[in-house]
Amino acid sequence: MLDAAIIAIVTAACFFDLRTRRIPNALTFGAALAGFAFATAMNGLSGLGMSLAGWAVAVALFLPFFLLRGMGAGDVKLVGAIGAWLGPAGALVTAFFTAVAGGVLALVVVLARGYFAESMRNLWAILMHWRVFGLRPVPDMTLQSSRGPRLAYAVPIAAGALVTLWIR
């Protein structure tokens, strides 16, 4: 049941993210609530506690990227929903494999689209901005203002979740 639910969630998220570049709140919130309910049904209040902890760990790991305007809110809510199903340890493993998959996908996309040199210049500018001003959003470099290729980050999130299911 758990594997099937996560596969359904990430499949739907990828479908929406690839088509519309958005992940619906109904999907992310509904998936999180279903994860809380499933954990409670399986293990009572301790299950609910682990589910809430999984949601919190996942959101805490990805929220900074949203606050720095490098990731959409739907992506954060999606990893939170996955964390609600997998608990805190599963959320950590999923976050790791999501980061790996996201890095590989980003590299493939920038190389395929001839954007590598500009992306390295942008990365340098962001790092210098953070060095001078601290970890704050770079006003001219947000998801909304970017001219570069965009990633449907539900895809690496799905990859991270599926690898987590596979190795556990």
How would you describe each model-predicted region?
Residues 1-168:
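A membrane-topology feature that recognizes alpha-helical transmembrane segments
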